[in-house]
Amino acid sequence: MRRAVYEMMTWWLERGVDGFRMDVINFISKTYPLTDAPQGEGDLYGNAFAAVANGPRIHEFLHEMNQQVLAPRPGHVITVGEMPGATSAEAALYTDPARGELDMVFQFEHVSLTDGPGGKFDPQPLDLVTLKQNLAHWQAALAPATTPTGAVSAEKGWNS
């Protein structure tokens, strides 16, 4: 399957595509065996996040993709990975240029800042200070390997 994805990416790159947005890319490695997700009291469904996100081979897979498809075109391709549930520490690993995985990530932690006791369908007023603290935390956590200015550069990615 990975080889087929690399072939598809190469096909698009040969036609002039400059980059890829990779949705839920942190879900491509799973913890096996897959089991039923634990279901909280009153929940309609279980939460499988621990079994499907940031799996044991995720960094291996992303590095392999980078080396086989992207590295042969230095400076010509940009990658951004959508990573629901990723922590800032995980995002720093995914975007560290020395690791050769992704250029940027985007996440949704700040979106949940208005979740009330009933979750996202029970929104509460947004506290501007909390939002600023959240975004500043992400910028500081990713700053060692990236440009926290909001500008995308060829050498470093912007993450938030």
Where are these regions (language model features)?
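Conserved alpha/beta catalytic core and glycan-binding cleft of carbohydrate-active enzymes
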Residues: L62-S160
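Short, acidic/polar
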Residues: M1-L13, L135
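Aromatic- and acidic-residue-enriched carbohydrate-binding clefts of CAZyme catalytic domains
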Residues: Y32-P56
